[in-house]
Each structure stands twice: as structure tokens, then as C-alpha cells.
A protein has these predicted regions:
Chain A
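Glycine-rich phosphate-binding loop of actin/hexokinase-like ATP-binding domains
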Residues: 130-188
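ATP-binding/phosphotransfer module of carbohydrate and carboxylate kinases, centering on a glycine-rich
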Residues: 1-67, 77-82, 100-108, 122-132, ...
Length: 321, 321
């Protein structure tokens, strides 16, 4: 029987699904907007729809899949498949048995993992990290997630490792929504960058960020909006992206000082869109924060691109023997 | 034949040597002031003298030792036994074949390790970390060194891991002598605390720190001076120690956010002298910097005490079969 696995990347704005073969090659895909209605029901339906569409695109029935791996933002119990808490997904503020619910509907095994964790694992096994022994993945998007890979394994600690975005680089500095002050994410998370852009406009600064947002037809300052504004020479965009780069660089240098890893891999919505030019700026900005600047590790860009989260999620399902 | 190992802790102010038996029990010890004359010759002689005295105290000849392990501050090549650079030891600004030189003089094998690395390994195998799977040791002294233990092994990365003292917590903040700004050590290293105390006195602040230093007969604000000043209610000492605690807490919380380790072990001259009351203050100060304050790991005090560095160094010599 054909071996087909589905991987789903559940995001705050979209649900991305891929169906891959035994060699991890993408055979089918689908993308659906994440419903914003209250309650988990509509999100569950949308996930099932994305799986069904991706399976159809790969010419298999959902029930013929060897399994579905789902990467979800927030706290995940990978043993039980319960999405403990996902503040960015409407209706998932409370624990929800996501894997079990989807499994019953689709008719195949379902496993759940953290979205950044599975994306970093994707880079480890199939992407920029495939020849590295150790690295730190920094996923720069709405928030800034991270994954620590040591001796070619994800490091979990007591279960909650990888919160580089919430490390402090500026005591008493900017607040993030959680109330923590001066963390890397307070400067670099896209949501917080948008809050700062709003505040700047209210204070009288000029920018094309929000005009571009409307032109493109977005409700948020998406990665594309930031990229286009930056390329147009917008001063506020340049300033806020510059501050985000410095914050990411400080936190990345800290983790290099502590763990002396072989590389930093930059991914996520903003990281992947900005690509190597911005990764190079992060590398330069790391220099003053490194104890040994002469042995600064490379800052690489995630290779699996937009589908990386979904492809990484498919790795949650082991190959059948 | 009796199995006796010597461990040496080479410090900027003193050289501590112990001779231990196969069960790591201390059978002899010696302490010698670190010579301040230029050139490595006098320091090498002092190390040999410390080994000889500790061996005599344990009733063995130096040549009968199974080996000597030396923990040295600075960059160490543990393969070749070369002390690459030890800025705190007069005469060791250039690479020096320390293990080979001592081995020829003493007549037994000599191994070299980083001082904080061997002290943390001592805690891992014989001290506060003996039942932990993973922890970070923070050695609070003249500088602030650290050691990362993962799955009961020291983590070295590409060879230079463990520089938690040089991670940034306050971009653009206080300078440390290396020129790095706003690092934890800039606030918490004893040398930098002394610099700040001098500056405060020049700015008109009152303190008993320097009077106590002279009473005790020291040339530096030693750990004992800080402790006695703090206990006397000195306001400047309380303020600077408080700021050091907050800096250590911020960096410790960062490493917990990244690695989610089971514990922080606090050691070093100041850490060991201040003991559990200050470790408890570090734990409290970590709270606002933790992403998951409810699962804050314990902050423990190193158990091997003053001789921990020398005992840890003895572990560089494996047991003979």
C-alpha cells in the first residue's frame, strides 16, 4: 500500500496541509483561512477540510493516510494529543483533545506537536540543519519561537525548553502582552512590532505600512507588508525591523555564549520572507554580544520555506516498516 | 598500591591542592598564595609546592600519585594540557604547556581543565547535582563562570560553551573590562562590583567596604568583606549585592527559559560564602524573568564548598582499573 502522511501547520491566520510520500516529497497540499469564530468546532472543521483537500490533491482518501501530524502554536501534550493552550487560535484557550477529535473524523492516527518544534525538526532532518550536530532555530513570526537541537535531537528539558523569545535582553524595557518586560519578542515579535507602529503613527510619525496593508488586503501588518514597506524605503519600517534584528541578535548571541552551537537557523513568517540578507544582518548585529566574536556561528535561513511547518509536522508520524 | 589523586584549583589569589582517595575523600590538603611576580615560572613553582605539601599531608610522595588534575581560570586546551590564556594569572597571557611542565617536575600524569568546568563537574558527580539529569552551575566570584550539564554530561558545544556571565541582560548597560556592555558579569562579577564601589565612594557615597577590607588585611573586596559589610547593614554593599543578584537572576532565568533545566546550582567564592539565603533571593528575583514562573527550578548552593574546585579537578584523573 502507498505510504502517504499528512502534515498540518495550524496557524493563527491560516491552516496549511501537505501530503508527503515516504521520501518526504510533497504530493499534495491545501491552504485554508483559520476561522475566527468562537469555539474550537469551526477550527476543527477547517483542519479536517484542509486534510481532505490535501489528500484529494495527492489522490488518496484521508482514511488511507498512514497518519496525520499537526503542529499547533502554544502548549501541547504530545503524549495525549491534547492542545493544552493556544492563545493565538480562537476557541483554544482551554485544553482540547485535538488529536483524538481529528483522528475520529479522518479515520487514521493523528499526532500533535508544537508548531515551532516540528518546523525546527523539519530543518534538522530535511533542511538547513541536516548536517549539523547542534543548532538553535529561531522562528520569527507573530511571536518568536525557538527550538534547541543538541546532538541531533530536540532538547526539551523538563518539557518547556526553547522559549528564547521570552529571554530578557533589556531589563525594564518594552512590555510584551504577557507583561514580561524587555524580552526579545517584545522588540521582535510581529504582533509587538505592529503595536509599536500604531503607537508611532499616533505620535505623528509617517509610514506607508498601514496603506500597504490595505492595498494588499490584509487586516494585520503581515510579513509581506513589512517586506514591501522596507523595500520602499519607509523609515519607520526600517527602524522597527532594525530594532527587531538587534533584539534577535542579542538573544541569539546569548544562546551561542551559553551553548556554543554550530549555527543559528532563522525561520518563521518574517525570517523566511526576509531571507539571507536579513540573516546576514543578524550575524553582524550579534558581534558585539558574542564573548568570542571571532568564532561567530553562521546564521542560516530555514530551507523548507512556507511549507516547512506542515512538512515538519508530517515527521510526527513515523515510517511504517 | 594505594590510589591517591591530587586536584589543584589554580586561582588568581590562591592555589588550593587536595589529595583524595579512590572514594574522593580528602586525605591531604594545602593552600598557597598565587605569586604576583611576572612570568609563569613562579606560579609553576607554587603549584608544585602546593602539590608537594598536599601529598605530604596525605603521606604519599608526589611521584606516587596516580595523577594530578588542575583546574585553571581561562581558556584551556584539555587535550594538550596547554593553558591557552588566563588573564587573571600573572604570566599566563600567552599559551603555556602547564600540564607537561608540572608532569615532568612531579613525576606523574597531569591533566588540565577549566576551573569552573571542573568545579561544576564536582557538583555533578559528588555534590548538589548528583541526582539531577540537567542543571546549570553559576560560579559567582571575581568573574561569573558557568557550566551547563545536560543528560549528566558537561555540554561543551564547539568547545567554548558556558559563558553565561557574558550574556547580555541590559543592552547598552554597564561595561565589563572586555568592553562588552550590559552583561550579567558587568553587574555581578566581584571585580566589577569593586569598581562600582570605588566609583560610588568617589561620588561621595559612604560605605564601610574599604575600611573592612583593611581591617581584614585584604587588598581587594573579597567575598568575606562583602559578606561582613552586608551583615553590618552597609547600604552601598546591600545595593550592589542586590543589583548583582538581579543580574544573576535575569541570566539564570534566561537559561531556564531556553533549556528548562531541573536546577540552578550557585557556587564560586561569593556564591558559596553567601549560601542559601542569597540563593533564595536569586530564586525570587528570577520570577519576573521566567516565562513559566510557576515551574521555577530550585536554586541550590554548591555542596563541596571551598575545596570544590580542587576536588572537581581531581576528577580529571580517571580511576585506575
Amino acid at each position: 500500500m502507498t505510504h502517504r502522511i499528512c502534515g498540518v501547520d495550524l496557524g493563527g491566520t491560516k491552516i496549511e496541509a501537505v501530503v508527503v510520500d515516504a521520501e518526504h516529497k510533497v504530493r499534495g497540499k491545501a491552504r485554508i483561512q483559520t476561522p475566527t469564530a468562537d469555539g474550537p468546532g469551526s477550527v476543527v472543521e477547517a483542519i479536517i477540510e484542509a486534510i481532505t483537500q490535501a489528500a484529494a490533491d495527492a489522490r488518496v482518501k484521508p482514511s488511507e493516510l498512514s497518519g496525520v501530524g499537526i503542529g499547533a502554536p502554544g502548549a501541547v501534550d504530545s503524549e495525549t494529543g491534547v492542545l493544552t493552550r493556544a492563545p493565538n487560535i480562537p476557541g483554544f484557550e482551554q485544553p482540547y483533545p485535538l488529536a483524538e477529535t481529528i483522528s475520529k473524523a479522518v479515520g487514521c492516527p493523528v499526532k500533535l506537536g508544537n508548531d515551532v518544534g516540528v518546523a525546527v525538526r523539519g530543518e534538522l532532518e530535511l533542511g538547513a540543519g541536516r548536517e549539523l550536530q547542534h543548532f538553535v532555530g529561531i522562528w520569527w513570526g507573530t511571536g518568536v519561537g525557538s527550538g534547541v537541537v543538541l546532538n541531533r535531537k530536540m532538547w526539551h528539558g523538563r518539557g518547556a525548553a526553547g522559549e528564547l523569545g521570552h529571554t530578557v535582553i533589556q531589563r525594564g524595557g518594552l512590555a510584551e502582552p504577557s507583561g514580561m518586560l524587555g524580552t526579545m519578542e517584545a522588540y521582535a515579535g510581529r504582533r509587538n512590532m505592529e503595536t509599536r507602529a500604531h503607537a508611532a503613527v499616533e505620535a505623528g510619525r509617517e509610514t506607508n505600512l498601514f496603506a500597504l496593508m490595505e492595498q494588499i488586503g490584509k487586516k494585520r501588518l503581515s510579513s509581506r507588508v513589512w517586506q514591501e514597506s522596507l523595500e520602499s524605503g519607509d523609515e519607520l519600517a526600517a527602524e522597527l525591523v532594525g530594532e527587531a534584528i538587534d533584539a534577535i541578535a542579542a538573544a541569539a548571541a546569548n544562546v551561542v555564549n551559553i551553548l556554543d552551537v554550530e549555527a543559528i537557523i532563522l525561520g518563521g513568517g518574517l525570517g523566511s520572507r526576509f531571507g539571507q540578507p536579513v540573516a546576514d544582518r543578524v550575524a553582524v548585529a550579534m558581534q558585539p554580544y558574542l564573548f568570542l566574536p571571532e568564532s561567530s556561528p553562521p546564521v542560516m535561513v530555514a530551507e523548507l520555506g512556507d511549507l516547512g511547518g506542515a512538512i515538519g509536522a508530517s515527521l510526527l508520524i513515523g515510517k511504517q516498516s
